[in-house]
From Swiss-Prot:
Name of this protein: Cobyric acid synthase
Single annotated GO MF: catalytic activity
UniProt record, GO biological process: cobalamin biosynthetic process
GATase cobBQ-type domain residues: 275-453
Active-site residues, as the UniProt record annotates them: C356 (nucleophile), H445
Keywords: Cobalamin biosynthesis, Glutamine amidotransferase
Purpose: Catalyzes amidations at positions B, D, E, and G on adenosylcobyrinic A,C-diamide. NH(2) groups are provided by glutamine, and one molecule of ATP is hydrogenolyzed for each amidation.
Pathway: Cofactor biosynthesis; adenosylcobalamin biosynthesis
Family named by the database record: Belongs to the CobB/CobQ family. CobQ subfamily.
Coiled coil residues, start to end: none
Length: 520
């Protein structure tokens, strides 16, 4: 097998990222050396490769599904939206400019060459490359400069399958309309369809499946059922829109080397085990919300997003996550009354955790002539930290031990340089952070994925809240692998894998019909 495949979608959040990961997992289990690829990604959730390059979080997840190390070539162009309708342009893992929509256009020709070089490189080193499109391939206002969808497919001669989300409704219109808006050369690369997130008996779809095949002259390669609990690495605001209500995870993922947690000192409530409630403030420019994934699979922990002060009232822990625009989100917190609510929590010794940008916001002052141009502004003053923004972004994976001797790993993606000032009540937190009373902060993303550290911290939170809660021996890495296996199972069980193999080996079949707009 030697080839590539592009997974396009009728819209954002149609299921491209998950289907790409599932195909990678299925192929890897079949013994195929496979890599993911996304030419251009727009996301605030990013990951850091072993050599310190920044790529989209979804591509790192897909690489994990494929069983390979993520690298910059898998996502050569990353756009990270910020304030004032500008985005940070990251090329081959390094930030190169702040651009708006019009300012981005002059870069496209040079970026197209980089994209194709990266794809050629991957195709030379792997048996198969599964490419993920961006948004919809039928964005006709963008087609002339497209480097992520049909522009990529045509330049690299990639067969294309288009996935549509039936759970949102209108999937057949979306599939047919997508094809009809493409020109003849682009249509010639579209090899078939996948229906995603179907609830119910797939036999009920048969009349529609046969009709869309007749209308387009292209087969439906599978109907993927709706499946709860896949939570894997949300990428953007559309993913967060589907964030579940606060329900505790019911099943533990046992960690083979887990030891009893000495920090667990739950209050006595007659033996009843209570739920620990976590509220994550949904900042307007929230980034790397994947930091809370480890809590979402922790049995007995209920995680929800919050945007109002009253939504923090019953939370045992409030998390202030990362942000692409620290000063702007600090101002938003003040306007919404959330800054005052956090100060009240701190005064009442109720736990608050800041991660990266959230840690900076909890500090005393922020000096920012880089990200917002705001100069010096006061933070919330809950931690003795001064943040100074630097044009050079800190990128890298980190490893250390905390004050208790527990090994920690994480990663950094930030422009802010932090100075911890003297405070009579401060103590170290995690590997790099500080804690004053119930308020703590760290610059490291991924710190809660460390099982022993997470158990100890949740035990402290439970004690502060007076909850009868004992952390489970959850192994987050194993939980992630099980969910990646579930994606591979969905592909193996519900897609025409023989057709996928033929597309990878032979490309799009010749002679597929052209469907003009208005055809029926």
């Amino acid at each position: 097998m030697s080839g590539g495949l592009l997974v396009a979608g009728t819209a954002s959040d149609a299921g491209k990222s998950v289907l790409t990961a599932g195909i990678c997992r299925w192929l890897a289990r079949e013994g195929v050396r496979v890599a993911p690829f996304k030419a251009q990604n727009m996301a605030l959730n990013s990951a850091v490769t072993a050599d310190g390059a920044e790529i989209g979080r979804a591509q790192a997840m897909q690489a994990a599904a494929a069983g390979v190390e993520p690298e910059a070539a898998m996502n050569p162009v990353l756009l990270k939206p910020g304030g004032q309708r500008h985005s940070q342009l990251v090329v081959l893992g390094r930030p190169v400019a702040e651009v708006d929509a019009l300012g981005y256009r002059p870069y496209k020709e040079r970026l197209a060459a980089i994209v194709l070089e990266c794809l050629d490189d991957l195709r030379g080193r792997f048996d198969a490359v599964i490419c993920e499109g961006a948004g919809s391939p039928a964005e006709i206002n963008l087609r002339s400069t497209d480097i992520a969808n049909m522009g990529l497919a045509r330049a690299a001669n990639l067969p294309v399958i288009v996935v549509g989300d039936i759970d949102k409704g209108g999937v057949f219109a979306a599939l047919f309309g997508t094809l009809a808006l493409l020109d003849a050369a682009d249509q010639a690369l579209v090899a078939g369809w996948v229906i995603n997130r179907f609830r119910g008996d797939a036999r009920l779809l048969e009349p529609g499946l046969r009709q869309i095949e007749r209308l387009t002259g292209r087969p439906v390669h599978g109907v993927v059922p709706w499946k709860a609990g896949l939570w894997l690495d949300v990428e953007d605001s559309l993913d967060l829109a589907a964030f579940p209500d606060a329900e505790p995870c019911p099943d533990a993922e046992p960690c083979p080397d887990a030891e009893p947690c000495p920090e667990a000192r739950p209050a006595s409530h007659g033996g009843r085990r209570e739920v620990l409630r976590v509220a994550v403030i949904r900042l307007p420019r929230l980034s790397n919300v994947t930091d809370i994934d480890a809590l979402r699979v922790e049995p007995g922990v209920a995680v929800r997003l919050a945007t109002r002060p009253d939504e923090l009232a019953d939370a045992d822990l409030v998390i202030l996550p990362g942000t692409r625009s620290t000063v702007e989100d600090l101002r938003w917190l003040r306007r919404r009354g959330l800054a005052a609510a956090l100060a009240e929590r701190a005064a009442a010794a109720r736990p608050v955790l800041g991660i990266c940008g959230g840690y900076q916001i909890l500090g005393r002052r922020i000096r920012d002539d880089v990200e917002s141009g705001a100069g010096e502004v006061d933070g919330l003053g809950l931690l003795p930290v001064i943040t100074t923004f630097d044009p050079v972004k800190l990128l890298g994976r980190r490893a250390a031990t905390d004050a208790a001797g527990r090994p920690l790993t994480g990663y950094e993606i930030r422009h802010g340089r932090l100075t911890v000032e003297e405070h009579p009540d401060s103590a170290p937190f995690a590997a790099d952070g500080v804690r004053v009373g119930a308020v703590a902060g760290t610059s490291w993303h991924g710190v809660l994925e460390n099982d022993a550290f997470r158990r100890a911290y949740l035990a402290d939170v439970a004690t502060a809240a007076g909850r009868s809660f004992v952390p489970a021996f959850t192994c987050f890495a194993d939980a992630r692998q099980r969910r990646l296996d579930a994606l591979g199972d969905l592909v193996a069980d519900h897609l025409d894998t023989g057709a996928l193999r033929r597309l990878l080996a032979e490309g799009t079949p010749a002679g597929l019909p052209f469907v003009p707009p208005g055809a029926s």
